[in-house]
Amino acid sequence: MSFSVETKEELARIQPRRRCCQLAELAALFRMDGSLQISGEQGLSLTVSTESASSARKIFRLIKAVFGVQTQILVRRKRRLKKSNVYVISLPARIGGRDVLQEMGITDSQGGFSFEPPSELLKRQCCRRAYLRGAFLGGGSVNSPEGTYHLEIITNDETHARILSELLHRFGLTAKVSQRKGWFIVYLKESEQIVEMLSIIGAHSALLNFENVRIVKGMRNQVNRLVNCETANLNKTVDAALRQTEMIRFVQNRIGFANLPSQLREVAELRLQYPDASLKELGQMLNPPVGKSGVNHRLRRLESLAEAFSRQGGVPRED
C-alpha cells in the first residue's frame, strides 16, 4: 500500500463530531467526485463514485449523520485495467422537504448551479479543516517522503482550485495552482508545508511517518555531504602531496639537497619520508615545530626553486 493510500485510509476513518464539519466534508467529497443525475424513479439526485471502500463507507456514514437517511452503495466492477471495484452512492436532491443540494452549496437559493461553496459552510476553522480533508480524500495524493516532496489536489473546476488554494493560504500554506490536460492541480512542494497540511486534515499517523522518514533522510543526506566533503578534502591532500613529492624529487635530482638551506632541506626530506602526512603533521615533525602556514611557505619556496631551475636550466641561488 502506497503512502498516499495509507494516508487516505487514515482520513477515511475520521468521523467529525459536529454537524457543520460533517456537512463541510461531505460537500467537498461530492464537489470533487459527484455528479447530478435525473432518473424516473428518484428524479434529481446527487451521485458520487469512488474506488475506495473505506471512503464509500465514510460517505455513507456522513449522509446518515447529516441528513438522517440511509443510502445504498452500488458496487460496480471495472472491466479494464486493474478491474477494481467502483462504489456508487446516490443521494436524492430533496429529503423531507430539505434542499440537499443547497445545503451542500451545490446550488444557490435560486436553484442555479453554484461554482463556490457558500461562506456559511466554511466560516469556522474546524469546517475549513473538514472541507480540505474531504477535498483530499476526493482528489488528493501525496508522495512518499522517501522520494520527491509533493502533495496535490486535482479538480476539473478552476474556481474550485482557486478556493482550495485560498483555504490553504488561510492556514499559512503557499499552495500553487497549475493546469494539466484540462485539470487544475493545487499543490505543495515544501516538506514543512506538507507536514502542516497533514496536520490540518487530521492525518496524524501519516504525519509521524512522514517526519520519521524525513529526519532519517535528512541525516543520511547530511552524512553523505560530510563524506563527500571529507573525500574531496582527502583527494586534494593526496593530489597536493603527490605534486609536492614529484617537485621535491626534481629538486633533489637537479639541485641536490646539499645546496638547499637547512629549513627547506628538512621539510623536503620529511615530505619524501612521509608522503601521506598532512601539513600539520609535517610541521609537528620539524625541529622546532612550525604551523601549517610555515610548512606551506617552505614548500612554496621549494616549488619556486624548481620552476626557476626548469625555466633557466641552471641552479638558482637560494639565500
UniProtKB/Swiss-Prot annotation:
Keyword Disulfide bond attributed: no
InterPro entries xref list: Homing_endonucl, Intein_endonuc_central, Sporu_reg_WhiA_N_dom, Sporulation_regulator_WhiA, Sporulation_regulator_WhiA_C, WhiA_LAGLIDADG_dom
Residue ranges flagged as DNA-binding region: 278-311
Pfam families: HTH_WhiA, LAGLIDADG_WhiA, WhiA_N
Gene Ontology molecular function, alphabetical: DNA binding; endonuclease activity
Keyword set includes Coiled coil: no
Domain of life where this protein originates: Bacteria
Key words, A-Z: Cell cycle, Cell division, DNA-binding
GO biological process: cell division; regulation of sporulation
Family statement: Belongs to the WhiA family.
HAMAP family to which the protein is assigned, alphabetical: HTH_type_WhiA (MF_01420)
Role of this protein: Involved in cell division and chromosome segregation.
Entry-linked NCBIfam families: DNA_bind_WhiA
Descriptive protein name: Probable cell division protein WhiA
Species name: Heliobacterium modesticaldum (strain ATCC 51547 / Ice1)
GN (gene name): whiA
